[in-house]
């Protein structure tokens, strides 16, 4: 088995609306069991730590809590073989452009 993989990010990585929901994840996270971090972990044999969260911004990755969850970077412990960061859309306010 490959090593530890930590996925950080917003809804672009969490995969809200893609069923099934990731077991044990907070409902508000919108985390799918079929999001790309889960697919990478499954195909490559990684032990996945998925802390992606819908609505997250760069601040939620680095310093701020989000819906009572700690900053996502706290999931890193130095043993990771792979870390992905998928964030930025919420920082630039992309949602209004989707509904315009």
Model regions and ranges:
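Proline/glycine-enriched tight loop/beta-turn segments at coil->beta junctions
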Residues: 1-2, 78
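Conserved SGNH/GDSL esterase-like catalytic core that processes O-acyl groups on lipids
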Residues: 22-100
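Catalytic nucleophile-elbow at a beta strand-turn-alpha helix junction centered on a G-D-S/GDSL motif
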Residues: 3-27, 92
């Amino acid at each position: 088995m490959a090593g530890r993989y930590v996925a950080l990010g917003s809804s672009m990585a969490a995969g809200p609306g893609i069923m099934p929901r990731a077991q044990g994840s907070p409902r508000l996270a919108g985390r799918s069991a079929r999001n790309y971090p889960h697919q990478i972990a499954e195909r490559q044999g990684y032990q996945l730590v998925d802390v992606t969260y819908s609505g997250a911004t760069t601040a939620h990755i680095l310093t701020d809590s989000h819906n009572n969850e700690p900053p996502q970077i706290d999931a890193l412990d130095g043993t990771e073989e792979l870390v992905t960061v998928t964030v930025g859309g919420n920082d630039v306010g992309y949602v209004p452009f989707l509904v315009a």
